[in-house]
Structure formats: structure tokens, C-alpha cells
Amino acid sequence: MSEPSEKKQKVATSSLEQLKKAGTHVVADSGDFEAISKYEPQDSTTNPSLILAASKLEKYARFIDAAVEYGRKHGKTDHEKIENAMDKILVEFGTQILKVVPGRVSTEVDARLSFDKKATVKKALHIIKLYKDAGVPKERVLIKIASTWEGIQAARELEVKHGIHCNMTLLFSFTQAVACAEANVTLISPFVGRIMDFYKALSGKDYTAETDPGVLSVKKIYSYYKRHGYATEVMAASFRNLDELKALAGIDNMTLPLNLLEQLYESTDPIENKLNSESAKEEGVEKVSFINDEPHFRYVLNEDQMATEKLSDGIRKFSADIEALYKLVEEKM
């Protein structure tokens, strides 16, 4: 009888449980839905890279096959059939994930549409329709969109006109974050680790959690949102280590890959609340605006070398994985 008791005690005092008690919703960043249940996350996020990786696992072959079969029956041209099958793959994985998590799943719009507002809206509506057909209400789905000018405007339309919740990804700058809040999007995913990667490569020096540029960027955004009363949730993403994570404990949401979830699960190191909305209201900068001024948004974003390069790089990488998924489906079609 002692073994179950010991296990229960470990889970109760794990760093993962402490993070949850600090007020942060823990989100699993993975398409491998069988692997995430162990950590009992509130939500789950996916992206083209994660879906591509999961699609190659033999245990999930049946979902790919089902999506390919769907594609064969929907579409006039081969291209349309493949595109429909790819959307169905996203929804197949999302639907399975929602059987594991009690909250929401984030499903990403094709990154190749990052500079096309109209096409992004159309794709998002199609994904939501596929979820509806699968019995999943739109309230449980976050549509992930790259935080380009066009992406933010697409999310604005989806939220206001269609009541579709959006998760703005590839967000590397304060400028992007301000525009997203003004667009009344449901949630943003500011990146931590990729920002640190850029400055580490540029300067050649290591950073502590206190000096980490990615951590400081997310703190600034969080404080700005709370100070000015924006309802948009902040979900820190792209972590490189536990120190970055600990420095942001208390933030609204945190999306974590399986390796970091496992480290938190196995660790009993203390995690204390570092962020809270009340203290954040005392910090931050004065209110600024970008949402209705495209030239100003583009200029300020362009002045930020890191954000410009990382946004571009992120879109290229996600697009490459979409192309790889396209070829995988094409071969099966």
C-alpha cells in the first residue's frame, strides 16, 4: 500500500503541480495525444511541425488514412482533395486531443497564407466547420495564426464577425502584441526561447533568467495587458529551459513541450509565483496603438531586427513542414 501513497505524494508536490498552483494554466505543446494525458494539461497546442511529426508515428496511421479517405471524397481537383485531407488531419488530431484535455486545442492555419487575410479567414472557417462536423464546438478550438499584419486583421474579423477564438503565434515583439490586443483576439503566444536564441547568437553570451531577453519581452507584454485592462490571454511559448519557465510562473498560460513537462513532473524543485495581474498593473508603458495604422505597424516591426527575422524564419519553417505534409498526403492519395 505504500507505493501508491508515495506516488500520490510525489505528484502533489511536483514542480508541475506547483506551477499549476501558481495560477498558470499548463498547456501541452504536442500532437502526440497519447503522451500528454500523464501531465493533465488544461489545453493543448499544435503546429505544422508537431502534426507532421505525429503523422509519421505508426500508432496514428489510422487517422492519416481516415483523412486521406475524406480528401478523396471532397474536392474537384487533386490539389483540392489533398488540401481538404490536410485540414482533416489537423482536425483528426485536434479531436483526439480534446478527449484528453478538458479545455481547448489550438489548430494552426496554413503558414503559407500568412500574408493573405482573406485566405486565412476562409481556411479558419473551414477548419471550424470540420470540427463542428466532428461534434466539437468552436468554443473548444483556438485557431492559430501567424502575427503578421494580415494575420492580425484576419483574427480581428474571425473574433468579431464569427465568434471564432484565435491564438496568435510567431509573436516576437511588443508591437505585434499591442496590435493583437487591440484586435480583441482571445490569446497570444509570445515566444521566449527563440528570442533568446537570436540574442545569444548575436552576442555570444549566455543569459540568466533575470536577463533573458525572451523572458523580459513576455513580462513587458503581460504587464502592458494587465495595466491597460486587455482581456487577451498571454500564453508564453518556446521555452529552452526550466529557468525561463520559473521566471514566468503565474502567467495566464504556458505551453510546454513533452520534454519540459516530463522534467517538471519528475522534479520537486520549488516554483513560486513571479507574475500576477495586480502587481503588473503598476508596471508597463503608456498605451500605444497600431491596429488601424498599417504603415506604422510595418515600420516599427521592421525596425526590430530580431522580431522581423524570427517571424520570417518561423513562417518559412512552418511552411516547409506544411509542404512535407502535403507530399505525405499526396503519396497516400
UniProtKB/Swiss-Prot annotation:
Present with 1920 molecules/cell in log phase SD medium. One of its GO terms (molecular function) is transaldolase activity. The keyword Transferase applies. The active site is at residue 144. Transaldolase is important for the balance of metabolites in the pentose-phosphate pathway. Homodimer. This is Transaldolase NQM1. It is an enzyme of class 2 (transferase). The keyword 4Fe-4S does not apply. One of its GO terms (biological process) is carbohydrate metabolic process. Pfam families: TAL_FSA (PF00923). The gene is NQM1. Pathway: Carbohydrate degradation; pentose phosphate pathway; D-glyceraldehyde 3-phosphate and beta-D-fructose 6-phosphate from D-ribose 5-phosphate and D-xylulose 5-phosphate (non-oxidative stage): step 2/3. Keywords: Pentose shunt, Schiff base, Transferase. NCBIfam families: talAB. Belongs to the transaldolase family. Type 1 subfamily. It comes from Saccharomyces cerevisiae (strain ATCC 204508 / S288c) (Baker's yeast). Its EC number is 2.2.1.2. It catalyses: D-sedoheptulose 7-phosphate + D-glyceraldehyde 3-phosphate = D-erythrose 4-phosphate + beta-D-fructose 6-phosphate. CDD domains: Transaldolase_TalAB. Gene3D superfamilies: Aldolase class I. GO terms for cellular component: cytoplasm; nucleus.
